[in-house]
């Protein structure tokens, strides 16, 4: 039996990605083995290693993103371990956040494809100084993984609270919250081009924080059952984020995330 090719995976070190990102990648290409090198849990005991669901991120990696993540990759490939373990490709997954955008005079952003290409070329060149032939896959969530959730609503915010709400409550919440997201968070500027989010009048708004804030401030069931008690919800990257990353379907996301996600999707599927 032919052994699966091995991909060294360096994911942005957040709790959404910790336990669920490999499974998400397998939905795109299940013919390879994904070795997660970042983020990992603390190495304290055999039982912790045997526990497939990790509760905490190693303190040296926690929150690693952007330049720190890239530097971690470049340092890791210099270790003897990387050479000995024999990887066939390298995958870097990160939140794009407010990078690789240029701001127009009206304060709205557009994707700076040249800046994105220069970034990838620079990182790949550093990696290939040591491993000239290794493929490097850049899989960036633009602006954050929450964009993927919004792109596949039915498998994310449309269903993640089903165990908290009744069926009727969930249906009402899903419709109301989706309308609010489109009208007030994404707005007409970005609801059809979510990967360009989120400069408004030259100031950047972080998508995950906007979602967390509105779910804390607004009771979307208040006008549905104002005189009755109903569950109060919130959004946590560690809880709902991980759950939704396990649920969402890459093929659905492709329809709405047509630049950064599409590039990573096809590169991974073709490997």
Language model segments and positions:
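Conserved beta-strand elements of the Class I
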Residues: 7-10
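C-terminal accessory helical subdomains adjacent to catalytic cores in phosphodiester-
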Residues: 2-5, 19-53, 58, 72-271
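Short acidic, Gly/Ser-rich segments with clustered Asp/Glu that frequently serve as metal-coordination loops
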Residues: 13-18
């Amino acid at each position: 039996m032919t052994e699966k090719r091995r991909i060294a995976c360096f994911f942005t070190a957040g709790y959404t990605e910790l336990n669920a990102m490999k499974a998400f990648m397998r939905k795109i290409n299940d013919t390879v083995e994904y070795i997660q090198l970042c983020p990992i849990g603390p190495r304290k005991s055999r039982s912790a290693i045997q526990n497939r669901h990790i509760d905490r991120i190693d303190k040296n990696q926690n929150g690693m993103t952007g330049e720190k993540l890239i530097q971690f990759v470049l340092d890791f490939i210099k270790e003897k371990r990387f050479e000995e373990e024999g990887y066939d490709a390298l995958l870097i997954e990160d939140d794009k956040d407010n990078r690789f955008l240029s701001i127009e005079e009206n304060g709205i952003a557009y994707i700076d494809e040249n800046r994105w290409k220069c970034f990838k070329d620079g990182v790949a060149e550093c990696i290939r100084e040591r491993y000239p032939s290794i493929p490097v896959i850049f899989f960036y969530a633009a602006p954050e993984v929450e964009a993927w959730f919004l792109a596949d609503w039915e498998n994310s915010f449309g269903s993640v609270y089903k165990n908290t709400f009744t069926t009727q409550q969930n249906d009402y919440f899903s419709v109301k919250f989706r309308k609010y997201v489109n009208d007030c968070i994404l707005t007409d500027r970005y609801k059809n081009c979510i990967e360009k989010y989120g400069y408004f009048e030259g100031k950047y708004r972080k998508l995950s924080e906007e979602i967390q804030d509105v779910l804390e401030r607004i009771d979307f069931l208040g006008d549905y059952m104002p005189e009755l008690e109903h569950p109060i919800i919130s959004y946590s990257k560690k809880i709902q984020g991980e759950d939704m990353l396990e649920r969402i379907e890459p093929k659905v996301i492709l329809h709405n995330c047509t630049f950064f996600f599409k590039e990573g999707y096809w590169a991974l599927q073709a490997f």
